[in-house]
Amino acid sequence: THCISSAASDVYKRQHLDTPYPDVTFYNNIPSEWIESLFNLKNTINPIHRKVVPSMYQAILKETICACIRIDGQIIATGLGILDRDYIGIYAIHVKEEYRKHGYARQICTGLLKEGMKKGAQNAYLQVVEGNDNARALYRSLGFQQLYTYWFRVQPDENGNFPPEK
């Protein structure tokens, strides 16, 4: 999997954060409902991921800002901000397929950046999977610039098969 790492220095001083975010709900913790919704948005079916990932989220020691958008009571979009010194890392931006291209990801990103700024963040960073052109366009429009590319290597099992990604 190839990923692109992006960062925006002084993103808050730019004019990219003018999107209102009235649909976004924020939490200072990571609710189990949010994690389950994230699995559903990503179509995560791997039982190992479903078992291990919640404990990984719960083990985050840094201050978090968890965001979601609900329609008819169902979470249709997620985002997570993790604060570290004067940075906020943006993670888990996902929107249910039929709700894409309606500005929900922009609302979540803008909300996380502004809420992070209220808590002392002056810079932001994120990572995006290579080939996710829609996300990359959104992040560029928010002032992010590509810094570098990296990839993960996965060892095949004894039969030469690679584990499923989901």
Task: Name the predicted role of every residue range.
Residues 48-96:
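A conserved beta-strand-loop-helix scaffold within acyl/acetyltransferase catalytic domains
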Residues 10, 14-52, 166:
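Short amphipathic alpha-helix that is part of the acyltransferase structural core
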Residues 95, 101-114, 118, 137, ...:
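Conserved acetyl-CoA-binding loop-helix of GNAT-fold acetyltransferases
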Residues 126-136, 153-158:
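Conserved beta-strand-loop-alpha-helix junction that forms the acyl-donor binding cleft
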Residues 1-8, 12:
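Single conserved hydrophobic/aromatic residue that forms the stacking wall/gate
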Residues 116-127:
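Conserved GNAT acetyl-CoA-binding A-motif
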Residues 141-166:
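…primarily DNA-binding HTH/wHTH and HhH modules…
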